[in-house]
Amino acid sequence: MKASEEEYRLNFFIKNDFKRKICKSCKTPFWTRDEKKEYCSDIPCTDYYFFDINIKSQPLTVKEAREKFLSFFEKRGHTRISPKPVLARWREDLYLTIASIVDFQPHVTSGLVPPPANPLVVSQPSIRLEDIDNVGITFGRHLTTFEMAAHHAFNYPDHYVYWKEETTAYATEFFTKELGIPEEELNFKESWWEGGGNAGPCLEVTVGGLELATLVFMQYKITDNGNYTPLKLKIVDTGYGVERIAWITQKTPSAFHAIYGNLVYKFFNKIGVAYIDETLLKVASRFAGKIDPDNPDTIKIHRQMVSKELGIDIKAVEEELDRAAKVFQILDHTKTIMLMLADGLVPSNSGEGYLGRLVIRRALKVLRLLKSDVRLYELVKEQIDFWKEDFPQVLKNKDYILDAVELEQQRFEKILEKVPSIASTLARKSEITTEDLIQVYDSNGIPPDLLEEELKKKSVKFELPRNFYALVAKRHQTSTIKSAYDKVKLPKDMLEYITALQPTEKLYYKDQYMRSFEGKVLGVYKNYLILDKTTFYPEGGGQLGDTGLIIDEKSSKRYEVIDTQKVNDVIVHILKEEPSTIKVGDNVRGEINWERRYRLMRHHTVTHVILAAAKKVLGEHVWQAGAEKTPEKGRLDITHHKTLTEEEVKLIENYANSVISDRRPVKPLEMNRMEAEMKYGVSIYEGGVPNSATIRLLEIKDWDIESCGGTHVSNTSEIGAVKIINVERIQDGVIRLEYVAGPALVDYIRETEAKIVEASKIIGSSPDQLTSRLRRILNEIEEKNNLIIQYRRIIETELLNNLKPYEINGNKIYIIEGLGDEEENKEILRKLTSTDNTIAISISDNRLQIATSKNMRVDKIVEELLKGGGKGGGKGTFANVILNSKKSKEEIIEIVRKSL
């Protein structure tokens, strides 16, 4: 959609002598007070000429630019709010915070909940990976991490705050009065914005080739068929570039110098790269507006312009700028890594962890291309020291950040050992596509740049996509949200049946200890029953649905409830049989299986206790990745970058039992969503993100608070005690803890005791002497194993000395019969085939093991053997074959002869 001219013809522009002009280059309309201006002052229509503009503001650091912006709007009636983490954990569809408006999506922007203040101002650290391949090349125009300073106003039908006129006036005042940019240099370029299903006209604020801000007026919803419908809630969504404000006031040769100051020189030094010639850098930066990274020709033209301007050989220019760009990339990436990990990201192969690992590996790849020996964590440590006052969480989580980065580098170095074999596999393809390279990266973590050198050795050429990492990131930056209907275990016809039914009153929230109740039947469909109220808890939040009885008050017939499910706010009781005596309007009595429910309540509550204990022991990066509570045990999946030690598991268990012994109150409370976020942070969403204006929280006094819709005990003492019974790494970056509490712990102890008694009987020992008896048995086994090894060596020596080969066409063929030990066979075959032109075959009934020397292959021998029927195979120099019938030594020799 393109907005009409009237959308942009503001009274503010008319009153302040702004003229609407059409850019001579891009043909886009823009507003300016300079009647002679012919260009929109945005790149690539102009070079970066802000270096030449007389700006009255003193040079501002990023910190000073941020504070100047926030203070300006605070003085003008805006409430300053704290930024959210760079991990968008209040969103189920997005992993990273890509803009300040994300702070308020989807619940504020949809009108579900009010904003935390109105109007408000925030400086939100953001991460976007769509431009990751362009970082450094454009001297700071593209970054993966940046601060979006923003003022927002939310205009409701009954509450107007401000709109286009005031927003444009604020921008003009800030840039001209606060920063001292000459009024004639300020331009407002007409544009259109779309994102997150919303749209609206916008104005891009440009000065001297630099876009400093975008003023979006969100006023349309984009429907599924692509139409635009007006929104009731009209939102002012602005974005000012804090780093660009610092750059334009400092006029440094690149944005990196303005952002990082002396850290730029420190990075060049630590990486071991000579600093770029200052004059070359200034000229290159001035012409950088001409670079369109998606068009490699523009990069070439830019370098030619620099070469011509300075009279320097083009190759020297390219080498200097390429080297500097790589250092700038590492500066940018290490800050992004720092912020991601500080906010709790754990590198992995999925979700947000995948994106974190992608940035880390790209930084490691660049260091490798620069042939630098510096460890990546050393550079991240420099970033922490530099930003610790701006972002206190980076210092708080410093140990975890550095440990995780070093571990990732070690893993990356191990992965690179696979490069030769992966390159060999790729070299066999007739054409290497971008999809092939992405597949190799996703499966093995190997960047294509590092495959390139290996493939060149094999004379294989391929085109490396310039935006490779952006392509990969795009595939992984969002998550699909399941609807309420996708999450339940109910048939489609049942889902359709309940759409017209009223919400069920949740008695289990009024009293979690209520065991029975009376309710009215609202719906009966097959073996599904819906009541007006219930104390049966439906499956959710990892807690199984309740079971129990429904009793027909007329006939006194009892129906067994085998499960309980929920769709939106309607609770469905699943019966073992169809309730033939019950119809709509009847009154029934419900009784939950209390012993089962109470076990679930204990396991659910202790899950919260253990999660907080894990954070205390392992660090704030720990995040719930999944959970399940059954009557028999609880399961909690947490994010963590390495396997837990026995000591860590013991500490988590000790903390949990200490909290149980402390008899801490456990209290559910309801709170406005925004109020809860502002008070407790987004960690309240560890168990999932509820879609409601008011959210239910569970507070364990002075220990944990989290959004949770489950059922819990009212005091930690009711849990009794907890024992962690299993710990395993279920996937990269995720650790699973399994535990038992209360009666389930007693069951576990009894089962363990029974196993000890049984084991004692088997080895002829009493339970209290089990350990010493086992030690004696193990010592005996070890002695016998050593004896077996000695006998094997004697047999092996005897066999090798006496075995005579068959000669076929200059090849030696050894046949071994009757050895039963597979590992012993392999070792003998390996020794027999240590010289060229040798084949060794071990025969045991109809089973064959075949080995060849390195200059031969087993393929053809296997193929010939299987002609007579059988199965098996192998590759290279070893194979296993099972024949349909046993063959003599002579028959085997003849088959081998044919294969040769």
From Swiss-Prot:
Binds 1 zinc ion per subunit. GO terms for molecular function: alanine-tRNA ligase activity; aminoacyl-tRNA deacylase activity; ATP binding; tRNA binding; zinc ion binding. Gene3D superfamilies: 2.40.30.130, 3.30.54.20, Bira Bifunctional Protein, Domain 2, Threonyl-trna Synthetase, Chain A, domain 2. Its main location: cytoplasm. One of its GO terms (cellular component) is cytoplasm. Its EC number is 6.1.1.7. It holds the Pfam family tRNA-synt_2c. GO terms for biological process: alanyl-tRNA aminoacylation. Catalyzes the attachment of alanine to tRNA(Ala) in a two-step reaction: alanine is first activated by ATP to form Ala-AMP and then transferred to the acceptor end of tRNA(Ala). Also edits incorrectly charged Ser-tRNA(Ala) and Gly-tRNA(Ala) via its editing domain. HAMAP family: Ala_tRNA_synth_A. Belongs to the class-II aminoacyl-tRNA synthetase family. NCBIfam families: A-tRNA_syn_arch, alaS. Consists of three domains; the N-terminal catalytic domain, the editing domain and the C-terminal C-Ala domain. The editing domain removes incorrectly charged amino acids, while the C-Ala domain, along with tRNA(Ala), serves as a bridge to cooperatively bring together the editing and aminoacylation centers thus stimulating deacylation of misacylated tRNAs. This is Alanine--tRNA ligase.
